[in-house]
Each structure stands twice: as structure tokens, then as C-alpha cells.
Amino acid sequence: MLTGVAGVVAGAASMAVGEYVSVSSQRDAERADLVALERQLQAGAASKAEAERDLAQVHIDRGLPPKLAGQVASTLTNQVEDPAAAHARDRDGVDADNLTSPSQAAAVSLLAFSLGGAAPLATAALLTHDAGLRSASVAVVSLLTLAGMGALSAHLGGAPIGKATARVVLGGCLAIGLTHLVGTYFGVDTT
């Protein structure tokens, strides 16, 4: 039981730190893009015109007629309060007012891992007398928990529930299988 608790704590901490580092890097890249755009737009007429042409091309690629795309790009380059933010939003999909949050991502990851690990851990704690039943029950509860987490995340994100659930369960099966194989290889009792 103590090993299970340690595993959940270590896994949750690892996931949270990994998510924090990853999202921090993404946010740093977004900020660097904004600074580069601001510099480009302030570097002189030729540089500003190049940024405007690039933005017009983005809108042409999205289906606007060239003349209208040019008008949109000109307006976003010359007539809005924050041209760099407008370019970043339209060109790169970066919202300058709503950059990614490393702390929020880490907290969600920590919570998801902890909740995902709690159900199998509780199952193992309740079924202490029959190792075979405990092992099978933990596997089933783990898969049901994965399915529930996959469905919930798909629902919250507005994604197709079946596809997301299948992906999470398949990934979980692979992870469980790999963990079992490694444990068996090293002679760890996996029941």
C-alpha cells in the first residue's frame, strides 16, 4: 500500500513538473514571438510592409480574396491599438492577452494523475486477501478510470467522446502492459 501511495505521489509530482516546464517553454516562445513581431513592426517601413504582406498571405491562405486580405492586413497593421498582438493572433494563433499558464497546467496534471491513481489504489487496499482477484480488479478499475477520465476530458474540451476515450484507454493499456512486462522481467511480484 505504501508503495502505491509513493507511486501516485511521485507520478503526480513528475507529471506536474513536466507540464510546468513544457508549458513554460511554450509561453516563453509565445512571448518571444510577440517581441519579434513588435520589433519587426517598428523596424521601419520596409519591415512593416513585409509583415503586412505576410499577414495578407495568411488571410489569402484562409480563403479571403487577395484585395480583401490586403485590406484586413493593412487595417491590422496600421489602425489597431496593438498591431503585434493582432498579427500574433491571426498569423500564429497566439492570444497576447491570454498566454498559456504553466501553473494552471501543472495543477490540472497533478490533480488528474492523483485522481486517476486513487481508484486503483483504493481497490488494492480493499482487496488484500486474494492476490489474483486484487490484480484483476486493479486492472479493470484502472481501465474504467482511464475511460472516465478520457470521456470527461473530451466532454470538457468539446471533442468526440468515443475517440478520446479509446485513445486514453489504449494508451493506458500500453502503459500497464509495459509496466507489467518490466516488473516481470526484474522479478517483481505483480499480483
Question: What are the residue ranges of the model-derived segments?
Answer:
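Internal alpha-helical transmembrane segments
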Residues: M1-S22, Q26
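Interfacial loop-to-transmembrane junctions
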Residues: G148-C173
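Generic transmembrane alpha-helix signature in multi-pass membrane proteins
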Residues: A119-A124, L152
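Core segments of transmembrane alpha-helices
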Residues: S109-P120
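Small-residue-rich segments of transmembrane alpha-helices in multi-pass membrane proteins
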Residues: G117, R167-H180
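Structural signature of hydrophobic alpha-helical transmembrane segments
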Residues: G132-L144
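Juxtamembrane boundary at the C-terminal end of a transmembrane helix
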Residues: H180-T191
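Cytosol/matrix-facing amphipathic helices and coiled-coil assembly/linker segments
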Residues: V23-L110
